[in-house]
């Protein structure tokens, strides 16, 4: 006879894969005929984008493009600095253990290293190390037993736990082409030297069957001015974006985990508009939305019958019951003396955090490594541009509660604000890092489709036993093995605390 069960269905994530995979990509950039010959390379900025990926067994194929901004010197009477922008597609296959077809994957690429050379005045050789931040999630359909709907007594070990029950996961691409105006204080453009773009000010609003996501693309542009080819300026603009993502069954209990990744971005002068203060921007943003509910569930963790033989087959799956994220802000200040050449002006600066390594030990997160700060300088006499990279030592620690042996924890460095001020040949560097520590609570769930109730063969059960406690034993395991109850063991052996028994302790068992 089958035993009736009341079950609670759950959709959970399995333990996520979070890996940084580095890959070197080489590219030769040919200076077009419309540009003057290159005499020296000042700086090369590489911005990688992933537009598509294909998950295979043990590997992933990524496709996208690399945007190159080159600042170089020229030998010309009118000017000495020029800029060059080129974009090239790429396709790479990355090795990723435990990856399987059908997994949900997001990839956020960053450029970690750049090696460049000038074989001749019309050719620039660039070799860049791209670090692909790969996050893989796989969902599992699971369930837990709430109770048994039968007349016979069944001993149950109950557990109360909070689950992040996934209702729906959906990825959408926001793509747009629009004109943006530069602020009034910006001068007319002659040539763009460098662009940095990142997402900020994100928020969402929910409605009956959809959510509206929106935010800004913070764009920083370094450019040569139209009036003077030696004058280098910096301007920042915000490009707003928004989109509707359709979801089903949104309720008051619904919570959302939303991730944004820029898949493509470009900005250039609009040739159809006479003013040089109007730019045309094209962008593509991937937004990944996971809708879930926090369900507190009391369920049967283990069970047995003292008088019947319950036969069943079970499948054990490891899943993430819930994910807790802690946010920490770390501020770093460093004064560096005599670091700049004399007669130089600091025009721009940028921060690279890919050389900072997080380590998790017990309930402590330690950040070690260097924050690399890139400085764009201009000589006040020759007007020549130069680039200098300095290292700022990072050695920070902070405590995080909730990390255990059955947790999977990983750290993300997302906020990377920097401010550099110049005082002669000295600089003051202020760095603000926003750190997310994600803790996944892992759980092993025993999935049972059906339970068959049979007659118990008592011929192999002794009426009295003396059991010597071994390492890892609990009263529950002993009671289940000998078809008795915890209450009977406690009373027979005068046990004060049923949760505490000692190795070597003798337990009298009477059926």
Give the role of each language-model region.
Residues 1-460:
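Interfacial loop/beta elements and low-complexity acidic/Ser/Thr-rich segments
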């Amino acid at each position: 006879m089958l035993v009736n069960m009341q079950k609670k269905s759950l959709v959970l994530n399995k333990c996520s894969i979070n890996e940084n995979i580095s890959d070197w990509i080489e590219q030769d950039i040919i200076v077009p005929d419309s540009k003057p010959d290159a005499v020296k390379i000042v700086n090369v900025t590489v911005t990688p984008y992933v537009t598509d990926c294909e998950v295979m067994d043990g590997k992933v194929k990524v496709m996208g493009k690399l945007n190159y901004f080159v600042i170089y010197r020229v030998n010309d009477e009118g000017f000495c600095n020029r800029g060059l922008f080129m974009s090239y597609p790429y396709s790479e296959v990355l090795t990723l253990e435990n990856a399987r077809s059908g997994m949900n994957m997001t990839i956020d690429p960053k450029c970690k290293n750049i090696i460049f050379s000038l074989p001749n005045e019309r050719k620039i050789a660039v070799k860049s190390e791209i670090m692909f931040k790969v996050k893989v999630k796989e969902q599992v359909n699971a369930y837990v037993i709430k109770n048994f709907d039968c007349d016979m007594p069944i001993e149950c070990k109950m557990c109360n736990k909070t689950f992040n029950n996934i209702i729906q996961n959906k990825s959408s691409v926001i793509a747009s082409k629009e004109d943006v105006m530069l602020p009034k204080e910006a001068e007319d453009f002659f040539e763009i030297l460098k662009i940095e773009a990142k997402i900020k000010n994100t928020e969402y609003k929910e409605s009956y069957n959809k959510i509206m996501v929106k935010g800004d693309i913070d764009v920083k542009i370094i450019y040569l001015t139209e009036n003077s080819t030696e004058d280098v300026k910096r301007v920042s603009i915000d490009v707003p974006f928004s989109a509707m993502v359709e979801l089903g069954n949104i309720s008051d209990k619904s919570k959302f985990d939303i991730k944004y990744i820029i898949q493509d971005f470009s900005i250039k002068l609009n040739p159809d508009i006479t003013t040089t203060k109007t730019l045309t921007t094209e962008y593509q943003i991937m937004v990944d939305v996971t809708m879930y509910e926090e369900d507190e569930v009391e369920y049967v963790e283990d069970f047995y019958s003292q008088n019947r033989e319950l036969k069943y087959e079970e499948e054990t799956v490891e899943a993430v019951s819930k994910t807790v994220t802690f946010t920490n802000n770390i501020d770093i200040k460093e004064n560096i003396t005599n670091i700049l050449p004399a007669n130089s002006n600091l025009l721009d600066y940028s921060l690279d955090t890919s050389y900072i390594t997080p380590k998790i030990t017990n309930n402590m997160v330690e950040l070690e490594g260097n924050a690399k700060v890139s400085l764009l300088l201009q000589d006040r006499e020759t007007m020549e541009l130069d680039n200098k990279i300095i290292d700022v030592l990072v050695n920070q620690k902070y405590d995080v509660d909730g990390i255990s042996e059955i947790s999977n924890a990983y750290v993300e460095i997302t906020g990377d604000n920097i401010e550099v001020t110049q005082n002669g040949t000295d600089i003051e560097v202020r760095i603000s890092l926003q750190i997310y520590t994600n803790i996944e609570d892992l759980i092993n769930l025993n999935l049972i489709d059906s339970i068959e109730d049979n007659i118990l063969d008592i011929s192999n059960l002794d009426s009295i036993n003396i059991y010597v406690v071994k390492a890892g034993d609990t009263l529950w395991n002993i009671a289940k093995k000998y078809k008795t109850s915890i209450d009977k063991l406690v009373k027979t052996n005068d046990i004060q605390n049923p949760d505490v028994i000692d190795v070597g302790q003798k337990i009298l068992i009477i059926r």
